[in-house]
Each structure stands twice: as C-alpha cells, then as structure tokens.
C-alpha cells in the first residue's frame, strides 16, 4: 500500500568520531552506500549505523574500522552481498539481510531501499539523489540504517507466518555469502581472444554488407529498421504479411524476416548480419569493458530479482553467453580456467523432481526412479509413440510444454515459443495434464 501522505522524519544523527560511541551490547544495524550501482567498480561513500538509541553517520575513511568493531555485535543490514564485496578484506558477516527477507515476502521489490521506505510513508532520498548531495547522502544512509533496525522484527514475524523463516535462515542467508565469494573470485577472460574474434567478425560484417548492398542495388544502413523496411518492402517489393497503419514504419523484427526465408536470398544475409553484429557489440566488444585489472570479470549475481527464485546475472549477464552456432560457441573460448579445467555441475531436472514430489504424480515419480529421460518419456506419452521413436523435435516440444506448465504459460504463449497454432499448443497442455494429473 502507498500511503496518501508521506511522513517527513526529522531523524537527528551525529557524525561518528570514535567507534566506542556505538553500543555493541545490543543489536546494531548499518547501511553502506557506494558511488556506483556496479559495486565492483565503485567505492564506499558513506555509512549509517544505529544501535537502538543513537544514530551515526560514518565517513568513508572510518567505515572499515567501524565494521571491524561491529564484528563483536549482532548486526542487521541491507544487501549484505554488496557490503561483503565492498569490504572484501574485513569479512563482515551480518545476522539479518533486510533485502533478502523483503524479497521473500514480495518478489517485486526494487534494489533501492528508498522505494520500500517511501511506500511505507517515509520520505527517504533515492539513490540518484544521494549521489548529488553530501547532506542528502548522510540523511539517506542514516535513515536506511534506522529503517532496517525498526522493521527487522516485523519482517521476521511475517517470514514465520508464511513458513519461510527456515528458508531465509538456512538457505538464502548462507547463499549470500557463497555468492559474495563467487563475485569476488570472478572468472578469467582473455582480452586477446576477444579482440581476435572481434576483428574476424568485423571482416565478415563488411563482406555481408557488400553482399546485401549488391542484392538491394544500393547502400543503406542495414542496422536501421526503417531503412531496411523500405528496402525490403518498397524497393524490392517483398510481401509484407502484417497489417501496416498509414504513416507507420514496416516491422523488420525476427519473426517478419524469418517468415521471408526462401523468398529472397537477401533475407538470410540480413539475419546473419544481425546475429553477428549483436555478437560483436554485446560479447566480443562488450565483455572487454567488464574485464578488470586482475584480468577477470566480476559479475553481479541477483538473488532478489526473479519471480521463480532463480539466480540472474548482471554487469555483465554471464548466464546468457550464446551457444547456438559455431561462431557463438567460440566466444566461450575467451573464458579461461585458472588450473586448466572448468568443472560443470548441474542438478538433474531439479524443478521437475520438485514438481513430481509436490504433485505426487505417479508417472513422473516412476520415470525419475527408473532414471528415464523425463522429456523423452513425456514426448512418448503425448505423441503416442515408443520412447525409441521420439525425435529431437518431439522431445523439444515436450520440454517446452513441461516447463511452460511449471511456469504458468498459456496456449498462446506456448504457441509463440514453438511457432505453432495456439489451439494446437493448448491441446498439448491439456494432453499433458490429462496424462500427468
């Protein structure tokens, strides 16, 4: 709920001069601010500390001393992982991360605590404002430190009411520390390999451009949807299979172009150009910007972003390194192990095992107990063929159906994913639910 009226809190604080001013006999909350959203590239610019009675602002040069002192206390904070990275040589561990608790109660929360505070009626400065003004910074970090302290008991109470306190304590909080160590370790990435591949991609893009211009009969900006649309549908007269409003530009998204494959040889060249241009800008050139002085990429693992509880990755997204074709797979050569080996570990169909357990589906449980490939088993049942007769296409369809159902997909959404009629997709869903009630 957003209150009709916000409350301006006149919270007085003092600037800390001696760490012993903080009473560590009771619980202490703290909030640390960084000058960049990507905290791997940033530095600490201030800290707020609240001991239940007194509120302090801590200047950047005293933050590590204060954190060493606070190791003796029971502490609460917000975004412990960020703090652990910023305080890497302090090894600061807190007992309660407000960010994790709030996420479990509401997955739609935002990273900036000010959003939650303003929703609660507390007029707190947002991160963008804090960076502009020192007094705003001091107000922000102290207000946030006090808010973490004041709301901690309520969050714990609500977690217990929702039967999530055990998840919070025994899974999510230990995971924070694991992810912090992973982020600090980073992954080695070879700039020379990226540079070599970028140059190779640049040559191929130049050649593709010339071939495209040759078919078009003129030069134009291949990366401009407007110019490309005019070339394809006005100049070359290719069929446009979508209703176009007067004055609007032609759509040249992937679905439109893929529908024209085989109609004109320029289409395959444009699709290749697009894929290669994205590969070059996002990965071959883009990853270079994230390689720090230690030769490593330090991504940020987002523990509080997805609705499903999955981890995500940002700055850069290391979970989305392409692997569709040979050129894509070459990008992965740039990631080099420290000791000649990368270990890949993965749960075997963990989501579907959980689904089988919760739904008590006899067929799924039987398939897992027999160590069957669950997607092949489902494809066999849906298409009415033996497991040996299941094709790659059938298995791919079954996999899309299963995961689609797990995450609440509609017939329309599944149809789009599989590029089939929504009514046919709906029948797949109904057939699955009939076979695996």
Where are these regions (language model features)?
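Conserved "right-hand" nucleotidyltransferase catalytic core of DNA-directed polymerases
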Residues: 1-61, 71-80, 134-327, 336-341, ...
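Amphipathic, charged-and-aliphatic alpha-helical interface segments
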Residues: 390-408
């Amino acid at each position: 709920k957003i209150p009709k009226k916000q409350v301006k809190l006149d919270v007085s604080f003092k600037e800390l001069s001696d760490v012993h001013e903080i009473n560590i006999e009771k619980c202490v909350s703290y909030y640390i601010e960084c000058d960049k959203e990507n905290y791997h590239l940033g530095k600490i610019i201030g800290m707020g500390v609240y001991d239940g009675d007194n509120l302090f602002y801590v200047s950047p040069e005293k933050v590590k001393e204060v954190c060493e002192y606070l190791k003796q206390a029971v502490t609460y904070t917000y975004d412990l992982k960020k703090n652990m990275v910023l305080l890497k040589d302090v090894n600061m561990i807190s007992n309660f991360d407000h960010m994790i608790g709030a996420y479990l109660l509401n997955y739609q929360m935002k990273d900036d605590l000010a959003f939650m505070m303003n929703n609660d009626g507390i007029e707190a400065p947002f991160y963008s404002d804090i960076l502009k003004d020192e007094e705003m910074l001091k107000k922000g970090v102290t207000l946030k430190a006090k808010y973490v302290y004041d709301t901690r008991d309520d969050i714990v109470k609500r977690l217990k009411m929702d039967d999530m306190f055990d998840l919070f304590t025994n899974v999510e909080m230990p995971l924070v520390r694991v992810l912090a160590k992973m982020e600090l370790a980073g992954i080695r990435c070879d700039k020379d390999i990226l540079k070599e591949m970028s140059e190779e991609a640049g040559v191929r893009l130049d050649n593709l451009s010339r071939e495209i211009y040759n078919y078009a009969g003129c030069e134009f900006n291949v990366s401009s949807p407007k110019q490309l649309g005019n070339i394809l549908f006005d100049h070359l007269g290719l069929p446009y299979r979508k209703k176009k409003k007067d004055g609007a530009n032609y759509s040249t998204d992937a679905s439109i172009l893929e529908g024209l494959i085989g109609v004109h040889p320029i289409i395959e060249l444009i699709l290749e150009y697009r894929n290669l241009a994205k590969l070059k800008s996002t990965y071959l050139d883009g990853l270079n910007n994230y390689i720090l002085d230690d030769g490593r990429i330090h991504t940020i693992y987002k523990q509080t972003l997805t609705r499903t509880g999955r981890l995500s990755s940002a700055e850069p997204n290391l979970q989305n390194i392409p692997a569709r074709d040979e050129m894509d797979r070459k990008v992965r050569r740039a990631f080099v192990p420290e000791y000649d080996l990368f270990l890949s570990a993965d749960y075997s169909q963990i989501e579907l095992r959980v689904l089988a357990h919760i739904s008590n589906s006899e067929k799924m449980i039987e398939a897992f107990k027999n160590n069957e490939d669950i997607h092949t088993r489902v494809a066999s049942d849906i298409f009415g063929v033996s497991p040996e007769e299941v094709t790659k296409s059938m298995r791919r369809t079954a996999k899309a159906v299963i995961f689609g159902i797990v995450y609440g997909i509609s017939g329309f959404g599944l149809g789009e994913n599989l590029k089939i009629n929504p009514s046919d997709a709906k029948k797949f869903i109904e057939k699955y639910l009939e076979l695996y009630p």
